[in-house]
UniProtKB/Swiss-Prot annotation:
Topological relation to the membrane, as annotated: Multi-pass membrane protein
Positions of transmembrane segments: 24-44, 64-84, 113-133, 151-171, 182-202, 225-245, 261-281, 290-310, 351-371, 381-401, 409-429, 433-453
Catalysis: reaction(s): K(+)(in) + H(+)(in) = K(+)(out) + H(+)(out)
Protein name: Probable potassium transport system protein Kup
Keywords (A to Z) from UniProt: Cell inner membrane, Cell membrane, Ion transport, Membrane, Potassium, Potassium transport, Symport, Transmembrane, Transmembrane helix, Transport
Superkingdom assignment: Bacteria
Role played: Transport of potassium into the cell. Likely operates as a K(+):H(+) symporter.
The keyword Cytoplasm belongs to this UniProt entry's keyword annotation: no
Record-level Gene Ontology MF annotations: potassium ion transmembrane transporter activity; symporter activity
Keyword Transcription regulation attributed: no
Amino acid sequence: MNDTIQATDAAHAHSTHQHSMRALAIAAIGVVFGDIGTSPLYALKEAFSPAHGIPLTESSILGVISLLFWAIILVVGIKYLLFVMRADNNGEGGVLALMALSLRPLDSKTRVAGALMALGIFGACMFYGDAVITPAISVMSAVEGLEIATPHLSHLVLPITIVILIALFWIQRHGTALVGKLFGPIMVVWFVVIAALGVYHIARVPGIIAAINPYYAASFMADHLLQAYVVLGSVVLVLTGAEALYADMGHFGAKPIRLAAYGLVMPSLVLNYFGQGALLIQNPKAIENPFFLLAPEWALLPLVVLSTVATVIASQAVISGAYSLTSQAIQLGYVPRMKVLHTSELAIGQIYVPVVNWLLLFVILCIVIGFKSSDNLAAAYGIAVTATMVITTVLACVVMVKVWNWNRLLVGAIIAIFLAIDLGFFGANLLKVAQGGWLPLGIGALLFFLLMTWYKGRHIVKERTAADGIPLEPFLQGLLAHPPHRVSGTAIYLTGNDKLVPVSLLHNLKHNKVLHERTIFLTFVTRDIPYVRDDTRLSSRDAGGGLYIVKAQYGFNETPDVKAVLEEFGRSHDMTFELMDTSFFLARETVVPTHLPGMSIWRERVFAWMHQNAAKPTDFFSIPANRVVELGTKIEI
């Protein structure tokens, strides 16, 4: 009897686990695979762009389809899903998480560590270069289906694209948790539809299946040489969004993403590309728009609508990724403080960063108006993706050797294959710099300069502060030995270094000559892991006389919460805190550029401008503004 009950419980647990896995896989399809899932709208069309001069013969079609197929298998199916996704930082993925993981076993002061940090930051900057192109090209290519379905409405493609994009960014501040539940099922429908369209045409031209043989890819490269290498720059469009598989791993887990990729996404993409190839063999004139011409005439308008919805979902994933990456970069100290709003009480990852939102929209609208069509924009797409792919491979190599202690020869063999592929794609995309590749490169380079300037500037400020600082604990002992006038209430001094006396305390003692009966020195520290366990978050020291030194640790995926820290500290020390009865003392730093060693004077001025425009600590830490006392201090750099 007991055996029967245990067997039933085990079967129920297994069934529940499978159901949960399927639910996560469907949710992942709606978030992770939107970008790569909408690539069939433009990838093959761009590969046979007239500018490439590739004839639409059966052999060249088989060759290009073979290249697309093996790019998906090698880069998505093997590199990312089997290797890169193993390199998780406590379950979190993405280029910054990978960078933090690769730096962990290294001395942060070495040149190697500095180079890896710069690589990781540049990879993050290139993501933003990609983030401004994905919504523009995706939505535009979907709306361009109107040119096939109803040619007399072709003049409305640009206005409709602009309206959709403005609406998409406008709703961000309200959160997308509610409609987000529909993303997964809608994208499942999308992948089923594009697979069915592909199967229909494969059945009519079954010879296209021969493209599975890599001989056709190799033969195409050998026959066309330089032209074929240029085509590689378009082939990479089938991989846009591959980085999202790794970047969004923390939201869904590796297993659900692999299940979705191998079970639905990759088969659907392959079937659709093969279907487009079959259509072109049958009717080379279909190169006008091979994706939409897969559909029978009666299904064109519904397919345009479904495509538009799918591209909006793909754009949403990129926008959410930009918010998450910005939040990580703020916590890791690479970006100035910005206002980060949580749009859902239930979902921790649902955030909204107003500055990023409106900057993205402005740049995207400029791109749409400037490039006017997805064909023109396709030349700009790919270089940011391939640069990030190369950086991910290099950082993963360091993790394999330094963190996992894999055999160096084995790692060398694996990385040599992946780097050869990545660098091949990256080199092909460099040929498109003049046609539009300058755009993501320019955006990435500008952001890289700003982020490195901010990081270097903050480092100099910390050095100057530490050099002039006074050790905290001896100072407090002296203060208690000769105490100033004590006043009732609680004072919280926010400080970046729990070993030094906050400048705000020195100014308060100098001008007001009082010390609150309960005084807390609070320091927030960001770790190189995504999340910190609640039971290890707080550490505190009782300095006596109602003085406490408190350190709160957060992961780079978390947002510091002053209220939660005080509540936790109060519980452990049998105290209560009311924010409206507590005074917060902050040092308002004014950075003064000088000719002191550190950075060139013009970079110091840029840093000073960034510092001046960073979000106020009251906004960032959600402290009531009427409970804050800011005391000014000048720092020469």
